[in-house]
Amino acid sequence: MASVRETGVNVSNDGITVVLGSQWGDEGKGKLVDILCDNVDVCARCQGGNNAGHTIVANGVTYDFHILPSGLVNPKCQNLIGSGVVVYLPAFFSELEKLEQKGLKCRDRIFISDRAHLVFDYHQRADALNEAELGKQSIGTTGKGIGPAYSTKATRSGIRVHHLYHWAEFEARYRKNVADLQKRYGAFEYDVEAELIRYKELAQRLKPFVIDAVAFMYEALQSKKRILVEGANALMLDLDFGTYPFVTSSNTTVGGVCTGLGVPPQRIANSIGVVKAYTTRVGAGPFPTEQLNEIGDHLQSVGREVGVTTGRKRRCGWLDLVVVKYSTMINGYTSLNLTKLDILDALDEIKVAVAYIINGKRIETFPADLDSLEEAEIVYETFPGWKVPTTGITHWDQMPENAKKYIEFIEKFVGVPITFIGVGPGRDEMLVKE
């Protein structure tokens, strides 16, 4: 694989490089982050929680990441969990220990913002009770308590990391939140006293990791450190711009980077959108190009489309460029990473959605009104397959002609160059398009 510095999208030392999902998540952001982390000083998470999930294969070892930044794979990289992240401490320590068991030395390279909000078991209980209450109208959350944690944040009853070190306030907030949830959902069994004892211990274990993240990021920028931010989830799961209400509870856009880390927008130098060569989605919600047929089955099985966090099979369908173009409008991508191209290798023909026809009108942007999508006619562009393996390709001139046409069409339609092309699961199976 060509080095990152040969791509034209270097990790700048005069600003922040951001990696964002352009679809419904699971695009393969972690692999690109892992590759780029070879040349960065800081890797940060800005939003979400341990509802995110991705797998990295490095030096023959497989690592699963949920709450921790994937820059931990690079022994020289400092890693930050920013103020916009919601943190479930048992999961934080469990994930840290699993990485250490695989040989990574992490403890002096991972930091948590003192302004980050905490996720508790009562949030997870509320998550499950809310989904059960919704029944068939449930949105299919990960059950990690992320939504309820962001809810208490929005109502100003949330508990932040710094509250752990002011115990009287922590305890008062904790007891009130449990009482409020029991009023809302009815009395449920919950051992508050045992949980308070547990969090007194966790507070002491966490203390070495806690920092002022705003000052950390400011100093990193002033020192011209190379900074990479990995977004969790994806644009179509954004609270404001995604397929609401079938979304996550944080801002997954480039704007979420600024609010989640406390950095000004003008310090973002590069925004890389990660695009899977087809489309997948976990859980309920609109999916215009979903294929409930042999094509969908092929993409699911060959692509091994099973969620890292939930273990659920992902719904699969054709690439939807209406979604990717809409995502580009919001995030202003400077380049794209097309992933899992190899999963299309065996197909006779490949379709790409380029527009929707709704109420007789052709549109090329994603509508806010989800009901209108149910009646939408999807306009496809059809391409002949290339029918040869792309795995093992290391240079653009080795790419099959039909695959080149597919890639070039995406670039032209979206208006953004594709710089990286994934042709296999390994970190070395990433073609750099000059």
Curated annotation (Swiss-Prot):
A GO term from the CC aspect: cytosol
Name of the protein in its database record: Adenylosuccinate synthetase
PROSITE patterns: ADENYLOSUCCIN_SYN_1, ADENYLOSUCCIN_SYN_2
Catalytic activity: IMP + L-aspartate + GTP = N(6)-(1,2-dicarboxyethyl)-AMP + GDP + phosphate + 2 H(+)
Amino acids binding IMP: 26-29, 51-54, 142, 156, 233, 248, 312
Regulation of its activity: Competitively Inhibited by GMP. Allosterically inhibited by AMP.
Taxonomy, superkingdom: Eukaryota
Binding site for substrate: 308-314
Native species: Schizosaccharomyces pombe (strain 972 / ATCC 24843)
